[in-house]
């Protein structure tokens, strides 16, 4: 039997040899930043403080220490030449299922939906698979932070802010409970006739009024629970109600999924009655209630810029021009890749389409960086390039919103990220096959 010392020697040899053979196939998790780094001569797009030409960014221990022009570089700092390159904040997907959804057709690889209508105690981060293939492809597209979001029911649970680098969900989680998610009922659902799998007729779904009343009752019960605890009363612990306290205390927003104008209007009325902060997610008809959204300073997370029109009479470019129209109307908004981890890596193209259809590029960049960070409560750490924030950024050949630009390197909290992903691996693998074949036949 192999003794312990021999086993350790084998493990050490494997640790040295295996990465050499697999690093092209598997993205490697890198250790925390170990030395100060200065990138000089790049064009730095801070998002909040303009563009710095021929600038320098210095970071240490995962934090930006200084940013500007002609900075003094401390002794011992590793200097990187950024001449001709651009530096942008890491992109942020405000609505994703990255890490909790892998293959749509394989149920056991999806951990998005919980049973029941009210699950505010559910947090996405505890279910995150840090080895998800979608993490690498998302980072290659420039997305370095994502809000992984549970679904199902009326109250789905908490979105978790994830930094897309780490060995485990604990290492990746920036904010475990960043926002509560509510799926606003649809007043005009499609009705289907048929029979259930057991041969009996399907039960009719609850009416719109019944669902809204159920939601209001749950919030009333949770508020009473919070008030009873605050008054020092002895109450039986309920994890669902306990999770709601941060909402009533104004510490986190409620993200309300609503697309239709009637849905959005009713959701806004409800939020005003509850005196809670909300963000509309979806917002397909947001432009039709723009005045009310502006009046109450309610932002929107658009979930699909690259979408077909939802109604026969709408123009083909209705979704494409929505960001530009909301911007003109004064509505604050972010752009997301849309539901599903598969779509997080198309986030820059969603914003790029908005630019092609009238949205100023600087506003599109804000929609996938600082706006998303502000709406979801992490703007003190990410979303722009400023001293004191995390060193989470991209080094590119041009704007990340343009498909012709290359993202040459990413840093997450100062870590120099392995840029390999599964799509690049298969591209290189089968290009090698083609080249080998050509050498044989030529």
What are these regions (language model features)?
Residues 1-11:
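Bacterial N-terminal signal peptides that target proteins for export
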Residues 18-24:
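Sec/Tat signal peptide C-region and signal peptidase I cleavage site
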Residues 29-31, 35, 44, 48-88:
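Histidine-rich, glycine-flanked metal-binding segment
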Residues 42, 57, 62, 84, ...:
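Divalent metal-coordination and catalytic microenvironments
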Residues 42-45, 386-430:
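C-terminal cap of metal-dependent C-N hydrolases
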Residues 103-104, 109-115, 121, 253, ...:
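His/Asp/Glu-enriched, well-ordered alpha-helical/loop segment
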Residues 134, 139-278, 406, 412, ...:
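Polyanionic/metal-chelating signatures
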């Amino acid at each position: 039997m192999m003794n312990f010392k021999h086993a350790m020697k084998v493990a050490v040899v494997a640790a040295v040899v295996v990465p050499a053979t697999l690093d092209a196939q598997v993205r490697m998790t890198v250790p925390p930043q170990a030395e100060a780094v200065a990138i000089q001569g790049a064009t730095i797009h801070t998002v909040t403080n303009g563009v710095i030409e021929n600038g320098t960014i210095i970071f240490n221990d995962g934090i930006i220490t200084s940013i500007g022009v002609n900075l003094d570089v401390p002794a011992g700092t590793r200097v990187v030449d950024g001449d001709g390159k651009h530096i942008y904040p890491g992109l942020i997907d405000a609505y994703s299922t990255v890490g909790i959804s892998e293959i749509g057709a394989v149920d056991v690889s999806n951990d998005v939906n919980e049973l029941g209508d009210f699950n505010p105690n559910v947090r996405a981060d505890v279910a995150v698979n840090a080895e998800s293939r979608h993490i690498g492809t998302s980072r290659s597209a420039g997305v370095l932070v994502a809000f992984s979001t549970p679904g199902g029911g009326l109250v789905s649970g908490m979105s978790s802010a994830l930094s897309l680098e780490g060995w485990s969900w604990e290492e990746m989680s920036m904010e475990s409970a960043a926002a509560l998610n509510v799926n606003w009922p649809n007043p005009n659902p499609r009705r289907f006739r048929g029979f259930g799998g057991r041969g009996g007729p399907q039960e009719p779904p609850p009416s719109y009024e019944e669902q809204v009343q159920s939601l209001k009752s749950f919030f009333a019960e949770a508020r009473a629970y919070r008030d009873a605890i605050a008054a020092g009363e002895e109450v039986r612990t309920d994890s669902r109600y306990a999770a709601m306290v941060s909402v009533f205390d104004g510490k986190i927003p409620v993200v309300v999924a609503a697309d239709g104008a009637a849905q959005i209007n009713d959701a806004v009325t409800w939020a005003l009655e509850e005196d809670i902060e909300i963000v509309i997610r979806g917002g397909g008809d947001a432009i039709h209630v723009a005045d009310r959204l502006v009046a109450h300073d309610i932002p929107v997370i658009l979930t699909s810029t690259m979408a077909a029109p939802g109604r026969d009479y709408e123009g083909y470019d209705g979704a494409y021009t929505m960001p530009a129209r909301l911007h003109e109307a004064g509505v604050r908004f972010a752009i997301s890749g849309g539901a599903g981890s598969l779509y997080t890596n198309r986030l820059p193209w969603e914003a790029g389409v908005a630019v092609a259809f009238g949205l100023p590029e600087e506003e599109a960049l804000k929609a996938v960086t600082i706006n998303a960070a502000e709406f979801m409560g992490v703007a003190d750490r990410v979303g722009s390039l400023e001293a004191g924030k995390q060193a989470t950024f991209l080094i590119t050949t041009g704007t990340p919103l343009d498909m012709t630009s290359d993202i040459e390197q990413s840093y997450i909290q100062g870590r120099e990220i392995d840029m390999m992903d599964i799509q690049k691996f298969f591209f290189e693998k089968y290009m090698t096959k083609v080249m080998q074949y050509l050498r044989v036949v030529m």
